[in-house]
C-alpha cells in the first residue's frame, strides 16, 4: 500500500505541520501556556486577565505601527462572527465585495442576508485569480480578502481610486502578521489567531480606523437593531477596557500574546514578511521546476506568501501523496475541500521554518517517484 511508504528520516522536516489554520504552534508557546496556570479559572474582569488582553492589544499596536486614533478591538466568535458584526455595524447602506474564493464570498453572503442594507455589488473572479480593487459611488464599504485562504491568492491592501468616504474592510484572517500591509490603507483589518499568530480559534480581532469607529457610532445612533453578541459598539466599549463582552478563552489569548511577542522580538512585521517570502519562494521555485507540478495561481503577483497551492499533473494523485505524507507525520497538506483540485496546499506562516518547506518539497519528490 502506498501509505506504507516510509520517508527517510533525513528528508523529513523538523516539524511536519503545514496546515493553513489551525497552524503550527511553537513549543515555546505551549511552555508559556503551561506556566500561566494562575490565570485560569479567574475573572476576565479583573487585572490579571485584563492585563493579558492589554498585552495583546499593545503588541498588535506595535506590530502594525498603528497611527493615533486606530484601535485594536476584539471579541469572541472568530472571523465568521465578525462578518455578521460588520454587516450590522459597518455597512450603512450598501457595500461592494471582491470575491475570488470561499472566504471572500462569505462576507458578501452575510451582507446579502442583512435586512437593513441594500443588495451588495459583487465583483467576482475565478478561483486562482482575483479582481482588481475598485470603487462605486453607491457604496459605503469596499471589502476583499488580503489573503484568500482557500486558493492561495493575495490581493494588496490599497484604497481604490474614487473610494471617497467608503470604508475599506479587509479580511486579513490568514494575512495579518505574515503579509506586508500599510494599515492606513484600510479602515477595518480583521483577523483571527489560528493562522500567522499560531494560536487557537474562537476569537476575532479588528484594527479599526477613526472613520470606522465613527461609522459604528453613527449606525448605532440611528437605532439599527443588532444582536448584542454581534454589537460592535459593545465590543469597542469592552476592548477599550481590555475586556471582551463575554468570557474569552484564556489559552487562546496566551498563545496569541506569546506569538506577538516572538514576532516583535525577531524584528516585527518586516522580519515576519521576509520569512514568509523566503518560505514561499522555495515552494514556488520547486513547483515551477518540477515536471509534475505547477503553482495553481498563474500570476506570480497574486501568489500568497503564506498559503501556497500547487497543482499536480493528471499522472500524479495529489490525494495519495498527501496520504503518504500524513502517514509519515507531515500533515495538513490537503487542498481546501470545496476547491476540488488535484493539488496540495501548504501553510507557510512565520512559525514554519523555511528549511522545513524545502524538506517538504524533497519529501513530495521522494513520494511521487515511488507511487
Curated annotation (Swiss-Prot):
Enzyme class name: transferase
Modified residues (N6-(pyridoxal phosphate)lysine): 195
EC assignment: 2.6.1.52
Alphabetical list of Pfam families matching this protein: Aminotran_5
Family: Belongs to the class-V pyridoxal-phosphate-dependent aminotransferase family. SerC subfamily.
Quaternary state and interactors: Homodimer.
Protein purpose: Catalyzes the reversible conversion of 3-phosphohydroxypyruvate to phosphoserine and of 3-hydroxy-2-oxo-4-phosphonooxybutanoate to phosphohydroxythreonine.
Annotated protein name in UniProt: Putative phosphoserine aminotransferase
Gene that this polypeptide is encoded by: serC
Amino acid at each position: 500500500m502506498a501509505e506504507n511508504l516510509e520517508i527517510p528520516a533525513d528528508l523529513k522536516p523538523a516539524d511536519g505541520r503545514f496546515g493553513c489554520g489551525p497552524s503550527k504552534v511553537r513549543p515555546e508557546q505551549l511552555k508559556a501556556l503551561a506556566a500561566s496556570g494562575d490565570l485560569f479559572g479567574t475573572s476576565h474582569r479583573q487585572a490579571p486577565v485584563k492585563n493579558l488582553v492589554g498585552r495583546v492589544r499593545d503588541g498588535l499596536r506595535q506590530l502594525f505601527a498603528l497611527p493615533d486614533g486606530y484601535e485594536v478591538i476584539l471579541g469572541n466568535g472568530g472571523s465568521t462572527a465578525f462578518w455578521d458584526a460588520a454587516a450590522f455595524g459597518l455597512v450603512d447602506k450598501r457595500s461592494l465585495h471582491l470575491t475570488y474564493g470561499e472566504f471572500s464570498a462569505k462576507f458578501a453572503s452575510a451582507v446579502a442576508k442583512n435586512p437593513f442594507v441594500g443588495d451588495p455589488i459583487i465583483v467576482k473572479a475565478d478561483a486562482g485569480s482575483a479582481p482588481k480593487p475598485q470603487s462605486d459611488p453607491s457604496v459605503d464599504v469596499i471589502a476583499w480578502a488580503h489573503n484568500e485562504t482557500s486558493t492561495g491568492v493575495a490581493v494588496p491592501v490599497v484604497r481604490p481610486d474614487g473610494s471617497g468616504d467608503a470604508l475599506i474592510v479587509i479580511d486579513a484572517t490568514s494575512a495579518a502578521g505574515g503579509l506586508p500591509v500599510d494599515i492606513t490603507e484600510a479602515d477595518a483589518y480583521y483577523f483571527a489567531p489560528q493562522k500567522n499568530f499560531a494560536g487557537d480559534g474562537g476569537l476575532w480581532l479588528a484594527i479599526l480606523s477613526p472613520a470606522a469607529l465613527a461609522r459604528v457610532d453613527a449606525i448605532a445612533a440611528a437605532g439599527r437593531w443588532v444582536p448584542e453578541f454581534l454589537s460592535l459598539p459593545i465590543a469597542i466599549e469592552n476592548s477599550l477596557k481590555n475586556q471582551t463582552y463575554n468570557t474569552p478563552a484564556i489559552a487562546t489569548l496566551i498563545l496569541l500574546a506569546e506569538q506577538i511577542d516572538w514576532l516583535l522580538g525577531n524584528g516585527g512585521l518586516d522580519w515576519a514578511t521576509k520569512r514568509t517570502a523566503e518560505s514561499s519562494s522555495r515552494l514556488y521555485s520547486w513547483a515551477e521546476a518540477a515536471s509534475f507540478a505547477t503553482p495553481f495561481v498563474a500570476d506570480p503577483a497574486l501568489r500568497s506568501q503564506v498559503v501556497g497551492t500547487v497543482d499536480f499533473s493528471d499522472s500524479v494523485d495529489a490525494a495519495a501523496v498527501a496520504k503518504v505524507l500524513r502517514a509519515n507525520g507531515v500533515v495538513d497538506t490537503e487542498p481546501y475541500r470545496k476547491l476540488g483540485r488535484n493539488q496540495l496546499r501548504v501553510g507557510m506562516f512565520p512559525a514554519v521554518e523555511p528549511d522545513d518547506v524545502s524538506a517538504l518539497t524533497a519529501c513530495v519528490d521522494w513520494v511521487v517517484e515511488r507511487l
